[in-house]
Amino acid sequence: MRAAKMKQALKNWFAALLLAVPMSAAVASGGGHYEKVDIDLRDQVSLQHGAQIFTNYCLSCHSASGMRFNRLKDIGLTEDEIKKNLMFTTDNVGDVMVAAMDPKDASKWLGAPPPDLTLIARSKGADYLYAYMRGFYKDPTRPTGWNNTVLAGASMPHPLWQQQGVQAVELDAKGQPVMIKDEHGNLTPKLYWESTGLHSRRLPNGKVIQKEYDAYVRDLVNYLVYMGEPAQLQRHRIGYMVLTFLFAVMLPLAYFLKKEFWKDVH
């Protein structure tokens, strides 16, 4: 009886260990029905490109007060590269990332203060951000002239419209937006492409392909995930070492210890 209980306890321990990684990944991905984005924090080229997009476009209005410029060395950038290409609001590489726009002006022009983006990926999830940055469309009823399929009534104008192009909402005979159901049954505006951008192109049949823009946004989101927890690069390496130790050392020891304890039990 005791041997059976011991065996069941070991099974439960292994099951919990194997479930830990996918469960944590599910929590980090955020809720909602959004297309899955491929996040790879080992891809330094993607992280560096994402950092460039962030500092060139996002940092104009949004701060990242929990992130210092010198942490970008962790993704393979030198101090000279950081100062030359990514720093526009300070000369000190040890400073935190502060928005170029005054928060009071941002509140006045946009109707709400732009949120700090340090932890936005941990708060909203990578898939949400990926969908959000591809969901902008022209909406003349909004103060900024823009709206978003993911966050209706968003006060943020499209910062990357030159890269993506311009989507606009289709209107019915009464001048009201035409609404359709998406694959999940949610009502969403029916959009059409008014123009393409630097990273999208229109085929002869009229269909617009934006694979290049999708990759562009993926790099930005990849960086936002990294920025939310820069230490996770090291944490992942340590985690693999711990798991290797558990399976290569502790598991055999536990097995032989169990055999020694129960060798006289019949």
Predicted regions and their residues:
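Extracytoplasmic/secreted proteins, especially bacterial periplasmic and envelope-associated proteins
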Residues: 45, 49, 53, 116, ...
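Electron-transfer interface patches adjacent to heme c in soluble/periplasmic c-type cytochromes
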Residues: 77-186, 191-213
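Sec-exported extracytoplasmic/periplasmic mature domains
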Residues: 55, 59-66, 122, 134-138, ...
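Electrostatic cytochrome c docking/interface patches
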Residues: 29-52, 63-74, 82, 228-236
